[in-house]
Design a protein with these regions (language model features):
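Bacterial N-terminal signal peptides that target proteins for export
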Residues: 1-8
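Periplasmic alpha-helical coiled-coil/stalk elements that build and connect Gram-negative outer-membrane
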Residues: 3, 136-248, 354-357, 361, ...
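Bacterial Sec-pathway N-terminal export signals of envelope proteins
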Residues: 21-70, 76, 221-222, 228-263, ...
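Small/polar (Gly/Ser/Thr/Ala-rich) solvent-exposed segments
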Residues: 41, 64-84, 89, 93, ...
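Amphipathic alpha-helical coiled-coil segments
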Residues: 42-57, 133-157, 167, 174, ...
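Hydrophobic, lipid-facing positions within transmembrane beta-strands of outer-membrane proteins
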Residues: 97-103, 245, 306-312
């Protein structure tokens, strides 16, 4: 029994340790975000609300059936009679019950029909806004995810630089003790080491800040993330021209589709406002029965009534309200037209900017790779010169800083390239989960 209990505890401990230490990849973080991000959930709720609004607008054109029942009692005290017989004081009472069933149906109402069309278009627009929120989430998750990795890389470089400077500080102290260098070199190395210690503190805080930023999207703290595989990482220059991407964006960019829908809705709003000048026709049928019970009466009078009719309403003058509503709708249409023009310009700029950034990142990446190689060679040469007395400790410290700055720039460029590629796809409206899946294949367990 003790062995079984011990085995169970060990198994639970191992499982717990495995769960805690297991790193999350980009897709796992994204899936968590899709279920918890307030922005996406809000967009989904708004899409649901617009779908219900469409159903409500449709209900205006469907038959309406209602039932009404009323009950009343009447008590009367007073004199009754005529001049021949005289007046006699008496009391009477009665009660009545009336039930009415009414069916109504809109036969013609241009405003209601226009309202249904507008509701349908707004429902489709809200679905597009939901899709846009999902695309934006892909970029935000990638930004937050790789920002954490970038800050972790920076912390690693800062710590490596600190260790290198610490080693150089110890060597400088030893050289000073045997008279091979001046005390100023020791002070210079100590100053650089102190700076590296401060940089490490700042870098550690940046890591936690980045993790917290990611948590605001997913609602969960991510302690360990898969890292970018630098051994297999490569950049690819776009095979199409920027004008080709612009053409795709004009057809598929979600923000542009939303703006176009707003213009279309604004046009329909003009028609709905003008519908106030047109007559409306409605159908109504009702059936009612009434039952009256009078005290002392021999019978119970009952009456049944059936009514069927059409109601025509013709607007003649409404104080200028309809014309004012039409003018307002036309002004809103002009505003929507300007929004569409602005959206077209913004999307063109976004595509060109993202395209140029990707092209620049590809070229810069190759240059930074060479910069790291050159910085490593420069540091080796400077350290050799310091050993023979032709270079100072200041030169060594500068070369050390240059090397880790080059490594840091190269690492940051990798993340920048990935994000630039995603933003280009977002600008063209082609961004999807499949893009994250492709990136996720280039990750390794952190």
């Amino acid at each position: 029994m003790k062995k079984s209990l011990l085995s169970l505890l060990v198994g639970l401990s191992c499982a717990l340790t495995s769960t805690i230490s297991q790193a999350e990849d980009l897709l796992q973080v994204y899936d968590i975000a899709t279920a918890n991000d307030p922005t996406v959930l809000k967009a989904k709720a708004q899409a649901d609300a617009q779908r219900f609004a469409k159903d409500s607008a449709l209900g205006e054109l469907l038959p309406s059936l209602g039932f009404r029942m009323s009950y009343g009692e009447t008590d009367r005290d007073g004199y009754e009679g005529n001049d021949a017989q005289g007046y006699v004081f008496g009391s009477s009472s009665s009660d009545s019950l009336t039930r009415t069933l009414t069916l109504s149906q809109t036969v013609f109402s241009l405003g209601v029909w226009e309202g249904l069309g507008i509701a349908e278009k707004r429902a489709l627009q809200s679905e597009t806004q939901y899709a846009l929120a999902q695309q934006d989430l892909i970029v935000r998750i990638a930004q937050g995810y790789f920002d954490v990795l970038s800050k972790l890389d920076n912390l690693e470089f800062v710590q490596a630089e600190k260790r290198a400077i610490e080693r150089q500080l110890e060597q400088t102290k030893q050289r000073y003790e045997v008279g091979l260098t001046a005390i100023t070199d020791v002070h210079e190395a100590q100053a650089q080491f102190d700076r590296a210690v401060a940089d490490e503190i700042v870098a550690s805080n940046d890591v936690e800040t980045a993790r917290e930023t990611l948590r605001t999207i997913t609602g969960k703290y991510h302690s360990k993330l898969d890292a970018l595989n630098t051994d297999t990482f490569s950049t690819v220059k776009p095979t199409k021209k920027s004008t080709d991407f612009i053409d795709v964006a004009k057809e598929r960019n979600l923000s542009l589709q939303i703006t176009k829908a707003s213009l279309d809705i604004a046009s329909d709003e003009i028609d709905r406002a003008q519908a106030g000048h047109y007559p409306t026709l409605g159908f109504e049928a009702s059936y009612s029965d009434g039952l009256t019970n009078a005290a002392g009466a021999d019978g119970k009078p009952r009456g049944d009534t059936t009514q069927v009719g059409l109601t025509l309403n013709v607007p003649i003058y409404s104080g200028g309200k309809t014309q004012a509503a039409t003018d307002r709708a036309r002004a809103n249409f002009v505003a929507a037209s300007e929004d569409l023009e602005k959206s077209m310009r913004d999307i063109t700029r976004s595509v060109i900017t993202s395209y140029n950034q990707v092209v620049s990142d590809v070229a810069t990446y190759r240059a930074l790779e060479q910069a790291v190689v050159s910085a490593e060679s420069a540091l080796q040469a400077t350290e050799a010169g310091f050993e023979v007395g032709t270079r100072t400790i200041v030169d060594v410290l500068v070369s050390t800083r240059n090397l880790y700055a080059a490594k840091r720039n190269l690492a940051n460029l990798r993340y920048q390239y990935v994000l630039s590629s995603l933003r280009l796809k977002q600008a063209t409206g082609t961004l999807s989960r499949a893009d994250l899946e492709a990136i996720n294949k280039g990750l390794v367990e952190g």
